[in-house]
A protein has these predicted regions:
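Divalent metal-binding segments
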Residues: 77-128, 182-189
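Metal-coordinating catalytic core of metallo-dependent amide/deamination hydrolases
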Residues: 127-226
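Flexible loop residues that form catalytic
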Residues: 12, 64, 123, 149
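Domain-wide signal for the mature, well-folded portions of proteins, strongly enriched
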Residues: 49, 89, 115, 136, ...
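Active-site gating loops and adjacent loop-to-helix segments of metal-dependent hydrolytic enzymes
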Residues: 69-101, 140, 214-226
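N-terminal metal-binding scaffold of metallo-dependent hydrolase/deaminase domains
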Residues: 1-42, 52-53
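Divalent metal-coordination and catalytic microenvironments
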Residues: 7, 24, 29, 51, ...
Length: 226
């Protein structure tokens, strides 16, 4: 048993209570109790928190974790040419191992900053999801990889792939659908495909992520086209 004392604890209980001069009791890998320090017996395995603040883990709901190696490229560029000139060429040329390294870098940086769970909205279907899952488990961060899925794919193929990926025994990692939708002029909408994807996700009990009105331009396009 380990006891971390002399900390301010920000809780997630119904009252959103903040406990000053608090303590956290840990057994094995689990937090089993939090309370005022004075309410715990002295423990030889005590750690003095030095008045620091203990926060619940943060959740990043939109993290392009596989693009960390592009940092510094395309600064101040509009998002459309950034995709055309930087992101798309990178994705077409990178290897599985480059993707793994990029994701690992993002995971480590997130953990250091207090993020304990993230969602990657457009995970490349050519990535090795077993390697990504192993990396996530080794680093100790929860991950949701949304497999990028387009109307060009045969439904049975991506459904079988999604089913297989979610049958792995990894409690830290889930694989959802990262849906390809139109965002700029020239893109084509596929309403029947979107309905099929929704039905598949409902049947499999899995999640769905997509970009929607994330920029000024595609908000107008969405309004007129969908």
């Amino acid at each position: 048993m380990t006891l971390i004392q002399d900390i301010t604890i920000v809780t997630m209980n119904p009252d959103r209570e903040i406990i000053t001069n608090g303590a956290i009791r840990i057994e094995g890998s689990k937090i089993v109790a939090i309370d005022k320090s004075e309410n715990f017996p002295e423990s030889p395995a005590s750690i003095n928190g030095g008045g620091m603040v203990a926060l619940p883990g943060l959740i990043d709901t939109h993290a392009h974790a596989d693009q960390s190696l592009l940092r510094g490229l395309g600064d101040q560029m509009h998002w459309v040419p950034f995709l055309d000139k930087i992101v798309d060429p990178y994705l077409s040329e990178r290897s599985i191992h480059h993707s793994l390294l990029a994701n690992q870098l993002s995971m480590i940086e997130m953990i250091k900053g207090g993020t304990t769970c993230f969602l990657s909205p457009n995970a490349d279907p050519t990535d090795d999801f077993n390697l990504l899952s192993e990396a996530s488990s080794n680093i100790g961060i929860r991950a949701i990889f949304c497999r990028f899925t387009t109307a060009k794919e045969k439904t049975r193929a991506w459904v079988n792939n999604l089913t297989d990926l979610n049958q792995r025994n990894n409690k830290l990692v889930d694989v959802w659908v990262g849906l390809d939708i139109p965002r700029v002029q020239g893109d084509t909408a596929h309403p029947d495909f979107y309905r099929d994807v929704r039905q598949v996700c409902e049947r499999l009990g899995t999640g769905l992520a997509y970009h929607f009105c994330s920029e000024f331009e595609d908000s107008g396009y969405m309004y007129n086209c969908l």
